[in-house]
């Protein structure tokens, strides 16, 4: 039997251990120093090419405004960021707000694809996500808080459920699973992260069954605090049924049509049963909306919306309806260039409007309709017009200004003007 020889590996490790420990300590000290270098007290910090990478390494959630000193939109954004910064820094997952003069540090801006001002990006552990949401301080906080929240929150008590609902606010719908396995909704929590809150309640009292109107588990409760709506899904939790419920519940049962909700419809492929009213804020209209809500709950394959000609006559007139038309009317709109009128159900009369809406839906599903074209722009055209008109005016002014500068100073001396991002 061959004799075994003792290898010097343990001795080598003993010799290497002190320098390895020193190296690790130096890394830790460097990271701590970098973290202390950037204030966490809610101030907006100014970064340059030399400090930017260090900030990415030291700050888990860094919200960066790539700006230009001459940009008017950037100047209007600055006080909103100043207001939002201390609130964001105080979140359970703090977000630090920073700004970079990307007109001066163009190489840094180019690295992250900055081609206009302001460009806003949230860096999550160094990975950039462009932010294109609202720039108002309160909505900015709500939206960014949504970015850093877990895909699905785990709630272990009644107080945790209450805190989750309060902290989520009213900007996004919520889905809370009671007795639902987390794995069933985890994928949807990631897929629809930017559009809704998701949570699973592990432990809860019967009080919440009363509050959210469910009588058995598993149950997935959908909440729309902004519209004071809620609904319950009892399954089945397999196949496409669960995602269909989630996708259809991202919108409230009855959608008030305005510039904000019109954009939300772009992510939904259902047709819209649209009630056109004289004034969507009066008592008669409010009663009709309640009837529409009941119909919407039973017809989830359609979106139910309403709009008042008093509130938005420009939009209503695209359906060949004017202030002299007899209202309310019901149509089915494909969200683009066509809509359908149901024969014999063009106008809702006073009386039993629930029965009239049922007859309207029956006629629509039976194909007793007349198709018409919208008289204005298509859905996408109307959406684009909400933004493009202001952009067009700005571009005209910019080109006019450039023309004057070229005329008086010569083309060679004309400074480069980079594009500004509107909200």
UniProtKB/Swiss-Prot annotation:
It is found in: Membrane. The record marks 72-73 as: Contributes to redox potential value. Pfam families: Thioredoxin, Thioredoxin_6. The active site is at residues 71, 74. The record marks 135 as: Lowers pKa of C-terminal Cys of active site. GO terms for biological process: protein folding; response to endoplasmic reticulum stress. GO terms for cellular component: endoplasmic reticulum; membrane. Keywords: Disulfide bond, Glycoprotein, Membrane, Redox-active center, Signal, Transmembrane, Transmembrane helix. It is a single-pass membrane protein. The keyword Hydrolase does not apply. Disulfide bonds join 71-74. Residues 1-35 form the signal peptide. Glycans are attached at residue 181. InterPro entries: Thioredoxin-like_sf, Thioredoxin_CS, Thioredoxin_domain. Its main location: membrane. The chain crosses the membrane at residues 386-406. Residues 36-149 form the Thioredoxin domain. It comes from the Eukaryota. PANTHER family: PROTEIN DISULFIDE ISOMERASE, PROTEIN DISULFIDE-ISOMERASE 5-2. Acts as a protein-folding catalyst that interacts with nascent polypeptides to catalyze the formation, isomerization, and reduction or oxidation of disulfide bonds. May play a role in storage protein biogenesis. This is Protein disulfide isomerase-like 5-2. The lineage of its organism: Eukaryota, Viridiplantae, Streptophyta, Embryophyta, Tracheophyta. The gene is PDIL5-2.
């Amino acid at each position: 039997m061959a004799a075994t020889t003792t290898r010097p590996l343990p001795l080598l490790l003993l010799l290497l251990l002190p320098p390895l420990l020193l190296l690790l300590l130096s890394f830790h000290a460097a990271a701590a120093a970098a973290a202390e270098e950037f204030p966490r007290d809610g101030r907006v910090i100014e970064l340059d090419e030399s400090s930017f990478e260090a900030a990415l390494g030291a700050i888990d959630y860094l919200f960066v405004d790539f700006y230009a000193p001459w940009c008017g939109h950037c100047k209007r954004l600055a006080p909103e960021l100043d207001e939002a910064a201390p609130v964001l820094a105080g979140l359970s997952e703090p977000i630090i707000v920073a700004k970079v003069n990307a007109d001066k540090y163009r190489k840094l801006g180019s690295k992250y694809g900055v081609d206009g001002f302001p460009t806003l990006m949230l860096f999550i552990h160094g990975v950039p996500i462009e932010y294109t949401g609202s720039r108002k301080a309160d909505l900015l906080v709500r939206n960014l808080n949504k970015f850093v929240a877990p895909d699905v929150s785990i709630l272990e008590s009644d107080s945790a459920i209450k805190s989750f609902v309060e902290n989520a606010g009213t900007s996004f719908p919520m889905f809370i699973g009671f007795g639902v396995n987390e794995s069933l909704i985890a994928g949807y929590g990631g897929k629809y992260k930017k559009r809704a809150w998701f949570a699973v309640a592990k432990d809860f009292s019967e009080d919440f069954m009363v509050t959210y109107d469910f009588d058995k588990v598993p149950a997935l409760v959908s909440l729309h605090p902004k519209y004071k709506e809620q609904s319950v899904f009892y399954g089945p939790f397999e196949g496409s049924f669960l995602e269909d419920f989630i996708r259809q519940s991202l919108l409230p049962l009855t959608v008030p049509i305005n510039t904000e909700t019109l954009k939300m419809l772009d992510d939904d492929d259902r047709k819209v049963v649209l009630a056109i009213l004289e004034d969507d804020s009066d008592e008669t209209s409010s009663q009709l909306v309640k009837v529409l809500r009941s119909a919407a709950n039973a017809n989830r394959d359609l979106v139910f919306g309403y709009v008042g000609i008093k509130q938005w006559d420009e939009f209503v007139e695209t359906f060949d309806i004017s202030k002299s038309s007899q209202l309310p009317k019901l149509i089915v709109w494909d969200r683009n260039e066509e809509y359908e009128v149901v024969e014999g159900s063009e106008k809702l009369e006073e009386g039993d409007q629930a029965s009239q809406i049922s007859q309207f839906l029956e006629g629509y599903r039976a194909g007793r309709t007349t198709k018409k074209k919208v008289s204005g722009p298509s859905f996408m055209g109307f959406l684009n017009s909400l933004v493009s008109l202001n952009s067009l005016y700005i571009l005209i002014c910019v080109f006019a200004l450039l023309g004057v500068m070229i005329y008086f100073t010569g083309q060679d001396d004309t400074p480069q003007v980079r594009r500004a991002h509107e909200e």
